[in-house]
Amino acid sequence: LATSNSVPKASNINAQVRTDGIVSVDVLDHVAYSDGTTVKLKNNLQYDKETFKGLAFVSGDTVRYQASSETGNFPITYTVEDNLGNVASANITITVHKSDAASKAAPTPHDAEAQVAAGQKVRIPITLTGIDTDGDDDQLLGLGNKAPTLGRISEVGSDYLVYEAYPDSSGTDTFSYAVEDWTGQRTKAQIRVGVFQGSSDSGVYARDDEITLRPNTAATVPVAQNDISGDNTNLTVDKHVEVQGLDGVSVKDNMISFTTPGSATTDYIAYTVKDKAGLSDTATLTVNVDPNAAIEPPTAYDYRVPSAATIDKKSVDVDVSQWIANPSGTANELKVGVHPSASAHAHVKGGEHSTTITVDRTARARAVPYTVTNTKYNITSTEFIQVPAYGVFPPTLRPKAPELKVNSRETIEININDYVRVGAGKEPYIERADSVSATKASNSDVDVNDETRKYTAAKDYAGPASITFTAVDGKQGSDKTKIINSAVITLQITVIGRDVPPPTFSSSTIDVEAGADPKTVALTAPTNA
């Protein structure tokens, strides 16, 4: 919040969370500061170590808190500083209430929007933080009670959905997604995807980076993290870089490594990122060398273990290497650990430089705080690994299931046991006939019983299609205490047309400098056949 005042003003904040829950407070939303200045949350939270219960730490511009099993009010003092050196402090009072499944309010997920060209995919991020007054531990289940009609969901991640638009679609596709809290309450929100005909932009956009380091500092910079691929594919950093003022610059694993000179200066590295087609863009990494440069804490991010990765496992191994970085040095200076509060159920697997953490699963979902320490300067950052509960998981897609292909106008019969995985000793069923919907089918009346269904492809279509239904892992019968788990499942189908449609192309812009070396582009990569 920018004002005309010369000194930042921090406000007191109140937050609440259940016992053993997590809450995140965006501090800068409660700070007023002058126009033209920037404000940063300092990494020095203050609280009474004798009476304080729980775990509190700074993560970027937020204060995060994990409650213990004790209720009460726990104040924390936070401090912000602007770029002129002015500081201000205020209190966050966190009220921890007892976990109570009977009275807990349901989560309130947010609606989401996206747009995509026909025939293309788009990743839709789903916000799971701040949607529940009881804490930030809700789980994304996937689709809700309404499936898309202009495309299909091709992937369900721990905090995102991937939507694939059909090649002949246009308009607005409206469907729902579902989340579940720790008590089992499920709520839904809406997703709107604008699908347009015409070429999508498959270009590559490299963004400039800037870093400030002390003299004689070895550093590794993941320059591609903020670069963009128009078709959402991974980018690679070209081995050839142009360097001004630095020696020993190298590229490995899409990161640029170098050592700063021994005195204050500003140097530059021009680098190129490419997609799988060979489309590329160039950006500049500016390296400021300052003897008084601040030592930044390691960067780290949360990781939510997908339910599908935990099936029949009493423990899970999580490699956090792709979620951590060292903005003030090299990755070799980082050490991964587990916060003492979680040591009874988690530990680092392997040697001293291991980045893999083993988490034991328990009867309830667990958030394990892991630490990343810059061993050269002894600065530590903390984030969470969220692990589903042991023994109970909803039906999920069976890995490596056979592909579903059908000729247009023809019919295939699908046994859901071949495509849906459930717990040991259980069988998958379709919950209700009215939960089944199909796209690119000859009619909307899908022939179905609770174990098999038929799909008849439309006569004048070729391309991706789908069938969606609610799967359960048992039948209630007369045992009303039996726990039945359910999930909305989408099976991807490929319809083979009688006539092969012409391929479509994603538009691309290729910049070639006069007199420079030629560029090679693989035309098959931006082509959809």
Positions of predicted regions on the chain:
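Extracellular/luminal low-complexity segments enriched in Ser/Thr/Pro
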Residues: 1, 62-72, 160-170, 255-268, ...
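Extracellular interdomain linkers/hinges and stalk-like, low-complexity segments
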Residues: 1-36, 77-135, 176-178, 182-230, ...
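Surface-exposed coil/turn segments at beta-strand junctions on protein surfaces, enriched
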Residues: 18, 58, 69-71, 117, ...
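Feature targets compositionally biased, intrinsically disordered low-complexity regions
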Residues: 20, 53, 59, 71, ...
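N-terminal start-of-chain detector that recognizes signal peptides
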Residues: 37, 49-51, 67, 133-136, ...
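Solvent-exposed loop segments of extracellular immunoglobulin-like
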Residues: 37-43, 136-142, 231-238, 329-337, ...
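Low-complexity "stalk/linker" and mucin-like segments enriched in Ser/Thr/Pro/Ala/Gly
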Residues: 45-60, 144-159, 239-254, 338-353, ...
